[in-house]
Design a protein with these regions (language model features):
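Charge-rich amphipathic alpha-helical interaction elements
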Residues: 1-148
């Protein structure tokens, strides 16, 4: 029996490579999101530490210059936090875009695999029919030979 050869096998291979590439891109985008979230958490922690330090310093004798320095630092950290929140949102949007690209690549590969499976089933059906026809002809030939 001849071996099944899918005529679009190379195309399927390309689709699998594209899917692998999209998977790597999505994983990288997720790592960027996590890095940006970590940076945000660190900024928030630094701001909280500065606020707590200011509270403790106010309980002691502290000059207005020192209070202004603490406030300036806290305001700078608030601005950095706002910028970092935007960076997290941008990274999440980019990761979502990469996820959508991965989903699309998976759908395209899966559709081609379904075509391959259908072609293989059709090939096997035709091969079985050809084999059955050959067996029927052989039986008919033997029967005709026996009766002649």
């Amino acid at each position: 029996m001849p071996r099944f050869q899918f005529r679009l096998q190379q195309y399927l291979g390309v689709k699998e490579q594209i899917e692998d590439q999209k998977e790597l891109e999505y994983a990288k985008a997720l790592r960027v999101v996590e890095d940006e979230k970590q940076a945000l958490a660190e900024l928030i922690q630094r701001r909280n530490d500065s606020v707590e330090s200011l509270r403790q310093s106010v309980q002691k004798a502290i000059s207005p210059v020192e209070i202004r320095r603490y406030n300036n630092n806290i305001e700078r950290l608030k601005h950095q936090i706002a910028v970092q929140i935007e960076r997290v949102a941008a990274a999440e949007a980019f990761a979502e875009q990469k996820r959508q690209e991965l989903v699309q690549a998976m759908k395209e590969r899966k559709a081609l695999e379904i075509v391959k499976e259908n072609a293989k089933e059709e090939f096997l059906l035709e091969a079985n029919l050809a084999e059955q026809k050959m067996v029927d002809e052989l039986v008919s030939f033997k029967y005709a030979e026996k009766n002649s």
